[in-house]
Each structure stands twice: as structure tokens, then as C-alpha cells.
Design a protein with these regions (language model features):
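Catalytic nucleophile loop of clan PA
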Residues: 41-42, 160-180
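Conserved active-site neighborhood of the chymotrypsin/trypsin-like protease fold
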Residues: 27, 33-37, 44-127, 131-134, ...
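Short beta->alpha transition motifs characteristic of CBS
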Residues: 52-57, 127, 137, 162, ...
Length: 183
């Protein structure tokens, strides 16, 4: 869809991980299927979100757990109607959309440009490693040229475990610069 995601024309200033987690955490979700779970993040307020293809591959029942801010607290809500909009097995990406006419507008995150990242830049991930939702891990970019199975990857020292797959890797400007995976 047109206007599916936003890219900041002028990058915002860098901030602390603590500030950014408070700002961005609501846009990160847990993706559940009968055979497992992963992470994801909203691109738009209307419920379009990204996860990894391998998280939802072959699944027909996909539930998205979202954490809404309510009176200074985070409230978990499961959305049972998630439609697959697009999938790319080679890129290991899937675009989903929550189909719930009563859903509120969702917090979403901007995409950044991973080409401007440099080795040594600080990055962090938010996800659900081992099912532990809303876990934050931090590290640095180790290399931008890691090739595996015909694909180019960003490699980071940020701790990534099963369940992080599909979640965002952020720079310190609060922009998504990668989608965590390593199946």
C-alpha cells in the first residue's frame, strides 16, 4: 500500500536507549502461532506490521500480542485476526495486518537507512527472546558484510535468541535499521 512506511527526511538526534525504549516499545509486538512465536513491529498506525517469514511460514492462525499504554501502564491485548499481506522467503520477511475494526491506532516506528551505519555504531533490539516479551538487548554493529546462504546480513553483538526473530534492530535515533533473525 502507498505510504506503507515512513523514512525520516532529516534524521532525529541520537538519544539514550532508555529514552528510546519508552518511546518505541509500544510499537513492538509478539507474534504467536500454534507452532511457536517471534517478534514484529508496526509500520503504520492502521495495523500493518513486519515479522520474519519463518515465524509465520505454513501457519493459518496468527495472533499478535500488543502492549498498549493505558494510564502509565502497559496493557497486553491479543489480536486474533492477522492477515498475511505479503511474504518473501528469500528475504525472510512477512507483512501482516491486524484485521480488527475496533482496534485503536497503533504506535509505529520509522525506518532508517542501514547504509549509513558504520561498524562500531551502537544498536539495540526489542523482542521476545524465548517468549520473554519486551526484552531489550544492546550492542554494536560488528560488520555490514556478513554473507550467509546467498544473503547479506548486518552482524551485531546485540544478544539475539529464538523469539527475537522478526523484531526490530534500532539505531540510537529510534529508526529501524534491521529485522532480527537467525533461524
Amino acid at each position: 500500500p502507498k505510504g506503507l512506511y515512513t523514512i525520516n527526511p532529516t534524521p532525529p538526534p541520537e538519544r539514550t536507549v532508555r529514552e528510546l525504549v519508552t518511546q518505541l516499545g509500544e510499537a513492538v509486538v509478539q507474534v504467536r502461532t500454534p507452532s511457536g512465536l517471534g517478534s514484529g513491529f508496526f509500520l503504520r498506525e492502521d495495523g500493518h506490521l513486519i515479522t520474519n517469514f519463518h515465524v509465520i511460514e505454513g501457519e493459518t492462525q496468527i495472533s499478535i500480542e500488543v502492549y498498549h499504554q493505558r494510564n502509565g501502564q502497559l496493557e497486553r491485548r491479543a489480536y486474533k485476526q492477522a492477515r498475511i499481506i505479503a511474504m518473501n522467503k528469500f528475504a525472510d520477511l512477512a507483512l501482516l495486518k491486524i484485521e480488527d475494526k475496533d482496534a485503536p491506532k497503533f504506535a509505529h516506528v520509522p525506518l532508517g537507512d542501514s547504509d549509513v551505519l558504520a561498524v562500531g555504531d551502537r544498536v539495540f533490539a526489542i523482542g521476545s527472546p524465548l517468549g520473554l516479551e519486551r526484552t531489550v538487548t544492546e550492542g554494536i554493529l560488528s560488520t555490514k558484510t556478513r554473507q550467509m546462504q546467498g544473503s547479506l546480513y548486518l552482524q551485531t553483538t546485540t544478544q539475539i535468541n529464538p523469539g527475537n526473530s522478526g523484531g526490530p534492530l534500532f539505531n540510537l535515533r529510534g529508526e529501524v535499521v534491521g529485522v532480527t533473525n537467525m533461524k
